[in-house]
């Protein structure tokens, strides 16, 4: 893999004639999850404005095939603008069709696609490790809510409701996100005890090999939050693999 630096400073003409372009630009200011924060959620005028650089790249390279990925925008106007710029209608795909994680994303592509498969039967317990270090378990009090529901318990901490949720291993995981502290990591009830999902579990939920993110940067191993955030910001591998399989048609 060759890195070509900052997207804002790149000379796209050098890549003219490449056959395939894959793009997934910053989604923070498009996300419905963060719509309550006007400081963050300002659509394509915010951090997600890097989308327009990706469009510049698409027009300069003129690849035979392309795929753009992004969250469901909080604004219909943003969705319309993105679709007009890319030039094809998006398809909404939930990665639960391919993995143990529900993750709805829009994909804009001119790759010929077949019929979407039925939802995968995989759930959280199917990819959980046999044994987990004690450091991943919470010492905080928790309350069992309803073992027949996906959110089966609640951690007793001073944080927003979403961050207190403990998930039932008999269901699929909800959408992974980046981690910024404050109990943002996803939680599961494991043998009657609440714990945070491990880095390996985050990787498996995205369809990646174990310890895919166990790497060093500037001589230091990536932290738990950095590794999980990479997964939260990344693509679901089996979903993208299915889309790219259309190139064989």
Language model segments and positions:
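Conserved active-site and SAM-binding loop architecture
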Residues: 1-249
């Amino acid at each position: 893999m060759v890195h070509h630096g900052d997207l804002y400073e790149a000379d796209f003409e050098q890549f003219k004639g490449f056959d395939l372009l894959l793009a997934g630009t910053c989604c923070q200011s498009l996300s419905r999850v963060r719509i309550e924060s006007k400081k963050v959620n300002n659509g394509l005028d915010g951090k997600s404005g890097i989308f327009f650089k990706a469009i510049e790249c698409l027009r300069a390279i003129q690849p035979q095939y392309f795929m753009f990925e992004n969250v469901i925008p909080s604004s219909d106007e943003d969705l319309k603008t993105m679709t007009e710029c890319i030039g094809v209608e998006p398809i909404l795909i939930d990665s639960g069709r391919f993995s143990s994680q529900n993750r709805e994303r829009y994909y804009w592509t001119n790759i010929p696609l077949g019929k979407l498969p039925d939802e995968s039967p995989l759930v959280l317990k199917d990819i959980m490790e046999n044994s987990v270090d004690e450091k991943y378990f919470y010492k905080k009090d928790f309350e069992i809510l309803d073992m027949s529901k996906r959110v089966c318990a609640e951690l007793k901490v001073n944080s927003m409701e979403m961050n207190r949720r403990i998930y039932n291993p008999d269901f699929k995981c909800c959408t992974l996100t980046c981690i910024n502290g404050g109990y943002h990591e996803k939680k599961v009830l494991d043998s009657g005890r609440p714990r945070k999902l491990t880095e390996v579990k985050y990787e498996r939920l995205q369809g990646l090999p174990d310890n895919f993110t166990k790497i060093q940067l500037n001589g230091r191993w990536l932290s738990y939050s950095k590794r999980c955030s990479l997964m939260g910001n990344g693509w679901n591998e089996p979903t993208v693999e299915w889309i790219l399989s259309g190139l064989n048609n």
